[in-house]
Amino acid sequence: MRVLALLLAASGVASATDVLTHHNNLARTGAVLEEKLLSPATLKNQAFGRLFSVVVDGQIYAQPLVVTGLAIPGKGTRNVVFVATMRNVVYAFDADNAEPEPLWHVSLGAPMPYDRIPKDGGALLGQYNVRPYIGVTSTPVIDRERQLIYVVAKIAEPQCPGAEAATAACPVVYRIHSLALSTGTIAHRSDIRIPMTAPGISAADVARRHLQRAALLLANNRVYAAFGSHQDAPPWQGFVIAFDAETLHQIEPAFCTTPGGEMGGIWQAGNGPAADDQGNLYVMTGNGSFDPGAKQFGSTFLKLSPGLTALDWFAPATVGDLNLLDIDLGSSGPMLMSDTEEIVGGGKDGKLFVLQRSKLGGLQQHHWPHDRLSPPVQFFQAARPWRITLLSWFPFLFNAGYHHNHGSPVYWNSRLKGPTIYLWPEEDNVRAYHYDERTRFKTKALKGMMGNKGMPGGFLSVSANGQDDGILWAAIPYMDDAWVEIVRGTLRAFDANTLQLLWSSDGNEPADNFDFAKYVPPTVANGKVYLPTFSDRLNVYGLHAPNATATPKAASNLSKDPRHRGHVKGASGHARHGKN
């Protein structure tokens, strides 16, 4: 590892890259463009693999974040990777070395047992797809200037009995925290008031029925947290809530996606709200009431001011069908294409919409792909149709006829291929779409390997040295459907220009068996790849030192929790919500 550190220093990488937010930046491009060590050539010609793992308490639903050159009291200056878990524990680990103990860790309170969600018609056909605890489900965000990390946790107060207990008396609160980067000391914390009222529903019930799944956003000297449903247990609505970044005072008013209506959650499969250079926010909503005159925006792209006023919106011509048939537009999040005015996003119907940020366009008047008389700028089918099965003959009953998009597109401007977006829909090939500023996207995809059976597709990041040496990294189930079950996962690396497979954890590391972390992309920084898992551990990959064996090191004994089943055959079928 010390030899590798010298290589990093020699290549100018040692202080290069921080990853402070989900998908690397406020545009949510998913690209790190200062990677000088990892390239298609080094992955082909050198020993790349798992270097070590660190054990944590709980599943990891949040993307790991990285800070370089951080002074830790009594432990020197370190590169640090931050991990938050579903047991409400936040960790700071040495990002480069397999140390058995974290630099610091802090518990934010007892998590909520999974079975505290009401089953009044909304528990996903009786299935719980988040279990056994619900704690930190969103990716935190880091303010390097203030030396703080912001984290939202779902907390049971007082501590609830274990998930196996029968009682439903479980006070629940959402709480936002700011922690000192160097020590984990809590600087501020504040209970979150989700401003929903309904007959017979207490504040604890409101917190219980909502899920803060989308990554946090730091912009405009504020921290923004978006909410959707937990298990679709009504009543619930979508919200964006802002907090002062210094004090965590909740700033009123919050934004509700469906005032006077219902649903319209912002979950985005964990992807965060995006923000432009003016501080405006962009989100995508799921199924819900749609009446623009009443400011109800189910299955809609929304542009919000820094003060959370709706500035503009776009809804597909089929918005009524999307809402009726559970074909969420907001099953992934928006991505702002760098150096353009365009925003890209898509949902369960497998389409990608390309919109102009300065004029989203309102309600689409037609839905023929070649109609240019009304917004969007472009839209096209970006996921393949279902195979010919009984389900495919009845698309109106089973989420329409195309495989769903869950991971937001990621973007890289290749010197060889030009601007390109990548996505990996469920049960589909990994795909690349090339962009021309005059004609927009070429709708014939460059396709790579096929994905797993069923939910949820692949979750992507791009590393590159500017416009060169691009690698597309993907976290995806190894084989089985991860709609409800915990299944084996794999990490794959592709040449970003050709989609040729360069490396795979299941092909090159036969002993690298871990549980897939649903909806979470890998983090790439400074020659390493940080992969969260549901096996209660963070895996760290990189180039092995010259002449070193490729045997991975474990920071401590890995969890033997019987809940981690390696690979388990998942539930079948296509009528899936998958909001977790």
Model-derived features: positions:
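Mobile, glycine-rich extracellular loop/lid and propeptide segments
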Residues: T17-S305, T309-G362, H406-N413, T420-Y433, ...
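Sec-dependent signal peptide recognition
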Residues: M1-L7
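Extended C-terminal subregions enriched in glycine
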Residues: G451-N452, S463-N465
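Short, contiguous acidic/charged loop-to-helix segments that flank catalytic cores in large enzymes
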Residues: F396-A400, A445-N452, Y478-E485, N508-N513
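Polycationic, low-complexity disordered segments in secreted or periplasmic proteins
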Residues: T551-N580
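N-linked glycosylation sites
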Residues: N547-T549
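N-terminal signal peptide c-region/cleavage motif recognized by signal peptidases
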Residues: A10-A14
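A glycine- and small/hydrophobic-rich beta-loop-beta segment
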Residues: D339, K351-G451
